[in-house]
């Protein structure tokens, strides 16, 4: 096969792997009321259907990228797709809440293995700047549209078949990705296991995150100042402190401390976590609001979010890139975040009697336009000062904070809103808190990301082969 054709087909394969991950990050949202009814979840514990996935995904991203450097990225990618596919089938057969949570955790672990090496595979396959930009545009489109597409697919499958099929749908996609990936993706020469894998660091950070989220999720039942909540959160902070101490002393740490000194990466990563908190809350709470508060079916809920999906796709198809070249990434990012704040504010003030059109429709269109305008600038700015030798580490760190921050934010906002309000008022409070999170992201951009509004590129400070 022609080498150039093989590279582009390999890109399609890894994008299918990423699409499967993004679909599954949101496809369960519209099915949550059905899952809650069938498996007996409480309202607070229902967030674990989402958070078990997100915590495992975020907790193992860094170590997945490192293992890919050591033993080969194709091996890790295919292992992740295999585990994700098997866990999806297991989740589909779940007959109890505990079984589903375990399945979702394993899905997150498989997703982290494959996602942790995808960017490194793309960077290695596409070494010329123009080609790499084209490849990353395709990858960004998959990230931007995949999660929203999951809402529509979840609604259709839940309404016309049953909620179990939101997991079974991954089987044909996973099998195709495994077969084509083994054929098309070239293996990199691993550094060897003698370089060391920071498994202790991965265990510490994952345990810290899970304890923290569990403490927040159960705070509604035990109280925010109860020994149960304070003990779990304190243990989480203690494990986090041990993790930081360990990483500062290891020769080959999971997260080298030098990464924390890159201003643009830290600022953009913080803004990204706050942004995705708002988006996670919108899709999670919005699905419950439309079905419980307005009586929508699962499929109708998916259709209600379709304007958001379409606007994200439209903006990510090239419009955002052209606007960024014209006005700069920082200006476009600020406009996008402002649009999301406005959309969430509209949703928080939409009374129970407000019709879908024009109020909710306008909010969902504005939300999609804002999100589609924010993703590419955030990715661009976050990597603008990261040396290419640390590109994988930088992108992995950003993804970890985004996923885990979003999961913690979702758990916190859901817990706070349900403990302080009931019925429609709880939904309203959740939207207000989500809007405040995105507004905080805008403040971070204004205060921290003081980059010039010109094209921002990754600094070519190391050979491509060193990219992690």
Task: Map each language-model feature to its residues.
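Transmembrane-helix bundle of Major Facilitator Superfamily
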Residues: 1-183, 318, 327, 333, ...
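12-transmembrane solute porter fold
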Residues: 8-23, 28-30, 43, 227-239, ...
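Flexible interhelical linker loops that connect adjacent transmembrane helices
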Residues: 178-206, 248-266, 325, 389, ...
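C-terminal membrane-cytosol helix-exit motif in multi-pass small-molecule transporters
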Residues: 171-190, 206-218, 235-250, 441-451
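Short loop segments and helix-boundary regions at transmembrane helix junctions
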Residues: 5-8, 128, 184-202, 223-226, ...
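Interfacial loop-to-helix junctions that mark the boundaries of transmembrane helices
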Residues: 45, 98-106, 162-169, 195-198, ...
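Alpha-helical transmembrane segments
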Residues: 82, 204-209, 338
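Short helix-kink/termination motifs in transmembrane helices of multi-pass secondary transporters
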Residues: 20-31, 56-59, 73, 166, ...
């Amino acid at each position: 096969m022609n080498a150039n054709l093989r590279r582009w087909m390999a890109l399609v394969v890894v994008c299918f792997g990423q699409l499967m991950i993004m679909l599954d990050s949101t496809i369960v949202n519209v099915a949550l009321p059905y899952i809650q009814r069938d498996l007996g979840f409480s309202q607070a514990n229902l967030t674990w259907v989402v958070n078990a996935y997100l915590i495992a995904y975020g907790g193992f991203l860094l170590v997945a990228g490192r293992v890919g450097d050591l033993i080969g990225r194709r091996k890790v990618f295919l292992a992740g797709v295999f585990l994700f596919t098997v866990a999806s089938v297991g989740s589909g057969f779940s007959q109890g809440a505990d079984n589903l949570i375990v399945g979702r955790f394993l899905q997150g672990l498989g997703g982290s293995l494959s996602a942790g090496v995808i960017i490194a595979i793309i960077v290695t396959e596409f070494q010329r700047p123009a080609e790499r930009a084209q490849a990353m545009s395709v990858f960004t489109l998959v990230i931007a549209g995949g999660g929203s597409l999951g809402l529509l697919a979840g609604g259709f499958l839940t309404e016309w078949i049953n909620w179990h099929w939101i997991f079974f749908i991954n089987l044909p996609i996973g099998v195709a990705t495994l077969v084509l990936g083994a054929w098309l993706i070239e293996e990199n020469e691993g550094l060897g296991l003698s370089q060391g894998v920071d498994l202790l660091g991965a265990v510490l950070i994952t345990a810290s995150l899970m304890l923290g989220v569990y403490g927040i999720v159960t705070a509604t039942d035990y109280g925010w100042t109860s020994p149960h909540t304070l003990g779990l959160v304190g243990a989480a902070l203690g494990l986090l402190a041990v993790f930081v101490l360990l990483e500062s002393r290891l020769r080959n740490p999971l997260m080298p401390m030098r990464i924390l000194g890159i201003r643009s990466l830290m600022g953009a990563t913080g803004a990204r976590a706050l942004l995705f908190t708002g988006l996670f809350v919108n899709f999670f709470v919005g699905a419950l609001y439309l079905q419980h508060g307005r009586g929508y079916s699962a499929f109708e809920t998916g259709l209600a979010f379709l304007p958001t999906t379409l606007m994200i796709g439209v903006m990510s198809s090239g419009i955002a890139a052209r606007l960024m070249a014209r006005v700069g990434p920082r200006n476009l990012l600020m406009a996008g975040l402002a649009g999301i704040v406005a959309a969430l504010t509209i949703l928080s003030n939409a009374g129970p009697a407000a019709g879908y059109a024009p109020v909710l429709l306008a909010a969902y269109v504005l939300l999609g336009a804002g999100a589609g305008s924010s993703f590419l600038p955030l990715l661009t700015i976050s990597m603008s000062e990261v040396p290419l030798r640390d590109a994988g580490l930088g992108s992995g760190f950003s993804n970890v904070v985004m996923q885990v921050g979003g999961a913690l934010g979702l758990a916190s906002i859901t817990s706070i809103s349900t403990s302080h309000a009931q019925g429609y008022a709880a939904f309203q409070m959740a939207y207000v808190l989500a809007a405040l999170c995105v507004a905080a992201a805008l403040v971070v951009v204004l205060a921290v990301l003081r980059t010039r509004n010109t094209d921002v590129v990754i600094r070519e400070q190391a050979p491509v082969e060193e990219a992690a």
